[in-house]
Every structure is written in structure tokens, then in C-alpha cells.
Amino acid sequence: MRENRRIKVGVLAGVSALAFSVLTGAPALADGPADGLQEVEMPAGVRIVEGLAPGAGVDVPSLEDEADAPVMSMAAAKAAPAANTCLGTTAAYGAKGCFQHNGDIVWAGDTQKDGMSAAVGVYTDYGRAPEVCINRLGVNTWATCDKDYRETGNVRLRVLRYDGDTGKFYQPESWSGWIPVDGKY
């Protein structure tokens, strides 16, 4: 009886520690940039691609914060990603980005009405020149850049802001982890 209680207390302590580490390890986005926007140098030879509005009837990713989104069930979390699933969702002040493995589509979402555009840089692990997908469609919109990446490769997203008048990129920025192009982790 005593051993059973000890196990329950140990499990509860472990779950509490895990929940605390998730909350402190992934802080919520601020309403604005902490120290203002700071210019970012992009790698030489980066190609800028203007994103297009998704077609009618296309399921677009959510622009709401992950913390506000409904929690997935454990069964759904273990299932293989659906064809239109957006992987590697990454957000920074005013911008959100993700990668749809079916069709190699980069999504760039603009979340702030500040006169700037959302930008999602895409880097590969196999030496392809970096590209940036720009969303000039305005606040609360998604733009897509349809690319073709090597199926055996991985991509990494860099989300930041872009000023179309000056052609400059600005922090705050955020990076995703490596995302398999074929969607299979």
C-alpha cells in the first residue's frame, strides 16, 4: 500500500516538473518587440520570393497562439501527419511560419498591423541557397510559396519581419528545428 502511494507521488512530481519545464522553456510571445526592431543581415545570395494567397477552399493554418489552440488528443499526436499538416510551426513578433510537406509549401502568416510583412526564411541541410517567402498580403493573412525540396533532405525555418520599402529584415526572429521534407520524423 505504501509502495503504491510512493509511486503515485513520484509520477505526480515528474508530471509537475515536466509541465513546469514546458511553461518556462517556451515562453509566450510578447505583444511587441522587447527592445524594438533590429535589422538582420541575411546570407549573401538569399533569394526573396513573394508569397501568393492560398487558393479558395484551401485549409490554412491557424494564426492563433499555440497556447490558445485546442489541445490534441494523445492518439492524434501519435498518428502520422495528414497531407495538409503544417510542420515546424514557428512564430516571432508579427510573423508565423510553417512547412507543408505534401507539395513542399512554405506558409508565411502576418499577425501584426505594423506596416511590415511576415518573412519566412528556408534553409536546407544539403547546400541549397536560402530563400525567403514574403507575405505582403496584410495582417491576419497567409501567403504560400510553392517550392520543390529534395525528399531526403531537411529544411529549417527562420521567421522574422520584412520592410518592403527598404528591403531590410528585422528581429525579433525565431528558428524552427530541422523538418524532414518528406514529413517523416
Kindly give the residue locations of the regions a language model identified:
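N-terminal prepro-regions of secreted/extracellular proteins
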Residues: 1-93
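Mature secreted bioactive peptide module from preproproteins
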Residues: 76-185
